[in-house]
């Protein structure tokens, strides 16, 4: 089962999945990607 959350540390529009994933890892998540029309960074991890 995956837990999902918007990144709390990522600011601004998200255009790089790699950058998003790196920020998510500093928040304790295992992955992250840019999603949505507004391109926000969305983090995921196993829970």
Swiss-Prot record:
**Disulfide bridge map:** 3-47, 14-34, 20-41, 24-43
Keyword Disulfide bond assigned: yes
What GO biological process term is on the record, naming one? defense response to fungus
Recorded hits in SMART domains, A to Z, give:
Knot1
Under the heading PROSITE patterns, the entry gives: GAMMA_THIONIN
Q: What's one Pfam family the UniProt record gives for this protein?
A: Gamma-thionin
UniProt function note: Plant defense peptide.
* UniProt-recorded name of the protein: Defensin Tk-AMP-D1.1
């Amino acid at each position: 089962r995956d837990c999902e959350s918007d990144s709390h540390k990522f600011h601004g529009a998200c255009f790089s999945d790699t950058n998003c994933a790196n920020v998510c890892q500093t928040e304790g998540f295992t992955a992250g990607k840019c999603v949505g029309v507004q391109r926000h960074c969305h983090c995921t991890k196993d829970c």
